Amino acid sequence: MRSGYPQMENTDATPPVTRALAMISPALDPSIDIVVCIPCFRRPHYLRQTLESLAQQRTNRRFAVVMVENDASRSESVPVASSFLAAGKFPGVCVVEPRQGNCRAINAAFETALAMFPNATSFLMIDDDEIASRDWLERMVSAAEATGADIVGGPVLPEFDDERKRGLRRHPAFAPAYDASGPVPVIYGCGNCLIRRPVFARLADPAFDLRFNFLGGGDTDFFWRCRLDGMTFHWVEEAVITETVPESRTKPRWIALRGLRIGAINYHVQRKAAQTGWRRFKLTLKMLAMLPLSLFHAGRLVLTEHRALMAMHPMAVAAGSALAALGIEPQPYKASKIT
């Protein structure tokens, strides 16, 4: 934990750094109009499964894959990415972003895709520990074309290493935001999303605010800004992605810290929208008032869900918001915090 929002990564003080091109497909066609972006960090085994799921997509559409290695010292993802590109399983590139952090990696992926594929209209994203269902890309792109939505989202369903943890699928830390296809007010995560090209032109650069670089939540902030700008969202329940959840992420401590992080993100997203000192003061009071209210919500969940971990979530979120308002927050995306 460290002191909060004013010390989040400064977007102006960081000098530009050149990204290294680690691998590019032979005779890469820049006219491809669909690009899948993958930020990569120290999960080469899972990345291999992610890329295999992309290679097996059932679609006649041409697409490219942009992979961003965000650990320049180890570069464990580069050999995996290079092997798929060299084998011609799909066209694409792998670049190395030397500046560490979640938002750095995602921005590098989107910026590379936008620059290298000037005709691309649809930019999808999947994480390097996720597996796309066979029709994922086709369903996402078809929905975007049919609805005209600016942004399309789909469910990320947890797959637990320990099947005894299957009951956690309904926990807010793992459950998708929606359970039916159709228009939605906003989506919250970028682990299963499609963004149309004009979206990037309408928002300021960089797309993902670097103040969320180590906290996380740059995607929540990005989509919230899109909503405030009047952009439209659509949910495709059938465009399923599964996420590999290791046993370490099912422990009560990790789930509690996830709740704290969600609370901190909620505070910072709302703080950005609070333009005056008075509004920020009221926001701080609101976040502090959520603590006693969370006890009521926790009690209700104990009665309805009969699960202590489920009941703990609203208290952890409220505590995370209150701590962030006081200048204390987790930093799960610092390299030193990731194993």
PLM region descriptions:
Residues 52-62:
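Short, acidic, metal-binding catalytic loop of nucleotide-sugar glycosyltransferases
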Residues 67-80, 130:
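A conserved acidic beta->alpha catalytic loop
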Residues 97-116:
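Glycine-rich, basic loop-to-helix element that forms the pyrophosphate-binding segment
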Residues 118-131:
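Short beta-strand-to-loop acidic/aromatic patch adjacent to the donor-nucleotide binding site
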Residues 135-166:
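Conserved donor NDP-sugar-binding/catalytic core segment of glycosyltransferases
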Residues 154-155, 169-186:
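Short, flexible, basic/aromatic active-site loop/helix in glycosyltransferases
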Residues 213-224:
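Acidic donor-binding loop at a coil-to-helix junction in glycosyltransferase catalytic cores
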Residues 257-264, 275-339:
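Non-catalytic, C-terminal membrane-associated alpha-helical segments of glycosyltransferases
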